[in-house]
Structure formats: C-alpha cells, structure tokens
Amino acid sequence: MKRALPILLAASVAGAALAQSSPESILPPGFGDPLPPTPAPAPTTAPPPGPSATPGATVPGTPRAPDLSRIEDIITETLAEAEPVEVEPPVEYPDDRRRDPAMTGVLWPANIGLPGQPWGNASAKFLSVVLRRTDGPLASRWAQIGLRNVLLARTEAPRGVVPADWVAERAWLLLKLGEADSARLLVAGIDTDTFTPKMVQVAAQVALANSDPAGLCALETELPAVEPRLAPLVTAMCASLAGEGARAAADIEQARRRGKLPPIDIALADKVVGAGTDTSRAVTIEWEPVNLLTSWRYGLSTATAMMPPERLLDDAQPQVRAWLARSPMFPATQKMEAARTAAAMGVMSSDAMVDLYSAAYDYTDPDELGGTDPWRLRQAFVGKDRESRLSALRGLWGKDSDRVAQMAGWVTTARASILVAPDAALKDDADDLIAALFAGGHDGQAARWVKVVEGFDDEAGDRAWAMLALGVDQPTGLTITQGRIEDFADRDASSGKRRTGLLIAGLAGLGRIDPQVAGRLNAKYGLGLDRKTVWTRLIDGAAMRRQAGTAMLLAASAMQAPTVGEVPALYMFHAVNALRRTGQEGVARMIAAEALARA
C-alpha cells in the first residue's frame, strides 16, 4: 500500500480530503484502495479518498452543495475499479487463539431482519469502493440506522477480500457516520495479530475517536511502520500508563527537542503522560494559536476530560460532535448540543436522549432548572394536564429552529408523545406528534392517529396524513387514492413540490399505490420514476438477488445530500422498493415517513 502519512498531518477533523463529508482520516492517500494480498506492499491505481491535509489546513464544516450526479459518477467509477483480485489464503492460527476475522460483527442478522448472507455473491471489491465513497452524515436518520445495523451484522465477509481489511472498511465508514463506539465494537472483534496495515491505521483512528489513548497501546509494535512520527508519542503515553513514568517523560522530552511536531500535539501527549503514575508532570495546554482540530488533538484532549474550544468544534464536521456526545469523559450538561447533533444523525436513540436529559436534570441546580430543556422534558412526561405537557413538547420541538434541532426534538420526545391521546382538536400539533413517534420507531403508536387524521382535509393535516400513509404497518382506514394524493399536491408549497415527489415515490416503492396510479402521477408531476441509471440498475439487481446488505448500502449512498428534500424522487423510489423487497420494510417505511416529516 502507499506510504502512510502521519496522523499529525493527515488527521484533520475538519479537513478537505473527504470533501467536507467526513473527518480527515489518519490514513494515507489510497486508504481503502484495492490492495494486493496482504501484507505484500504494492502500488495501487485506484483514486485515494482525497488529497492529504497539510499542517494547519482546514475547511469549515459548511453544508455540502447538492450534486445529484455525484451518485452516478461514484457508481460508474466503482464499477471500473471493481476488478477481480486474488486473495492470499488466511494465515493459520492456533484454535485456542483464533477469532475468525471473516465472521466479525456484534449483531446476529436474524435479530435485525437480515438474511444470513446479506451481501450474497456481491463482489467485495465493489462493496469496498461503495463503502469508502459513502460519506456521512446522511440526509436520512433512519437510513443511517439501517446502514449501521448492516455494518455491525455478524456475517461472513464477501468473496474476494482480506477479512481484516473488510472490517477496516466497515469501521471506517462507521466513523464517518459518527458511530465511534460502533466502530470500536468491530475493531475489538478481531485479534491484533491478524491486523493488516490498513486495520492498524483504522484501529488508531477508532481509539482516538473514542477518547481512548490506551487503545493505541495494542498497536504499539505495528505503528512505526504505518505512522512513524506518531509512534514515539504513543510509546511515551503507553509507558506512562504502564507505570514507567521516567521513561515516558524522557520520550516526551526527546520528541520536544527534535522539534518536528507542533507544540500542541506534544503538549497533549505530555498531558496524557501526566495522567499516569509517578510522572509528577503538570501541563498547560495553549489553544489560542491552534486553528485546526485534528483527530489527535480531539482524542487526547477529550481523553483527559478537557473539552476542545467551541470555535474548533464549530469548524469540525458534525461527526465529531457525535463522537463527543458518546464520550464518557464529560457530564451530561456539557454534551447537550453535541447530543442534539448526534440524535438528528441517528447516533443517539430516543432512549439515550431521555437518559442524557435526565442526567442533566439531576446535575443542574434546582434554582436554575426552570426553562431548561431537561425541565421541559420532565414536564412533557409528568405535566399536570395535557396542555402543560403539550406546551413542554412544543418548546422541545422548536418549530422555528433549524432542521437539526427540530429532528433532535422529535427524537427526544418520542416516548413522551405516546402519552398524548389522538384528538381532532390537536390538528396543529398532530404532524409534530406523529413525526416524533416515527423518529422513535413507534409506528404502532402512530397508527392510533389514523382515524383522527382521516378527518383532516386541509393543509394543516396534509403532512400528518402523508407520514401515516407511508409509515404505519397497515394503513387500514386511511384514504390513499390518486385523488387524495392530488389534493396533497395542490396544497404542497414546498420548492418544486418536493414533498409531493417524495410522497409518490415512497407510496410506489412500498407498493401502496398500484403501478397504473403511480404511472399517471409520475407523468402528471414529471417525477421521472421510470428513468434508468447505473445506480437504479445496481440497486434493483441487489433487490432481485435478495442481497439485503448490498441494497441497504446502495440506498444509503443515495442519501448523500444536504437535506432529504434534495434526494431525488427517483432515488427514494428505488431505495424504498429495494429495502422492501429484501425484507427490510420496517426501515423502508421509516425512511419514507421521515422524508415527509423533514422535507
């Protein structure tokens, strides 16, 4: 593989190398590219994830500009790269030491609605390229949840891949999705003596994303080959954690004398050394001259319970806040904003948000609780009457807030929304209540609203009707006809009638309108659902072959847009349809309903 660049140069958390779609990795140009049989090094011609970052280089975490042709370009390039490769037979290890890297995962497929072989006979080369070309955060929270489950599934590695490299690809995508703890579960599932150079690099990144410098110690002997400038600092930190304080201090001072690394990076390593035994070291961290939050700086600062400056977090990608939300090093009150970002992405569940808000409630001085979000959430559960509970819910939804905060509000209030009985008098709140129920996956509770919403026949009830038409398991009692859809379209004020397009695409993909009705609506609104592209052929082929994992991965690749409203109806139709045909109808329904809530 290509020569590794050190983490201190290539680990920009807000770098340009992944086109603002994920943290810049510690990995060298060419990470994840097709490799010859491990471990023999050889050049590769596949495009790298992006140009390596230079010291201090950063690109603020601005939203990605929509480029709907990007998916097709990626798939075309993927097909060109996906050539067959010979795989060296795995090394034999004693039975009492072996954990088969070809069967790494923590979720049994049957428990998450997947077949035993979700990748089928798909080429590992093709799948690997799609994995590394998929960036987070995705436009759909439920698409991320579905993809995370597939990546964590304990299934046999697809044909034509070095098993450890397959784990590395999956863990790397999980990091790009903000799923640091999920990535750690994968990395922990294989023995370090089976690590390839690629796996070593990803494992180092995973340790830093999890604020776990001790996790680097298991890689200490392999790091010099792939991260030569990083290795001495890791050696010093591990020596300190092992109780060898004098040796650790000497290693740090030697690195400082060499002067080859930025002072902030040595100082942070020194702070970790100071946390060990028998070091007697006190280190002051000067953030003022620092304008870039690298993975190294994030990982070591949070490992020592030091929150990075807000200005650096603001410039970082959303994935970094998701890492922070899951970090155990900070009290709940310091992680509220990060947790909202993580909830909107799909990293934090509804139950996790309730737990976090409850911890923040307990941590906050009673005299300062009034008007805070933890106080509102408590009122949403135990308010003295319905109006007080609804008032608290409205405060958490934040109708006038940004999309991320609104989605986070729905996720946080999912369980509290169950306590509000369906009532026609709540027409103005019905869409938020139903959106919250679907955000938490409570489709059965949302179905209680069908009879009430069926009586809504104006714009105020349109979105609630559309979400129920798409999201409930059996929409019995809900009118889903061409006329009702056209009424929705007539009142649709979204730009380019995006909601109408997503509604028709979702209903057609779920099979809730017959092909003739879908065809007439497609022609009337110019949706282009009958158009064929490289991507549609691939995902339809995966569905036909019942490759549930491949279908989920390709569906997620179609959700790479700034907002779900910018996902073309064509992609939504084929994604939902493919998931339904591969036994993942529950996820398909949630993706479709979420699209109408957020568009």
Predicted feature locations:
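Solenoid-like repeat scaffolds
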Residues: 96-98, 110-121, 135-136, 151-160, ...
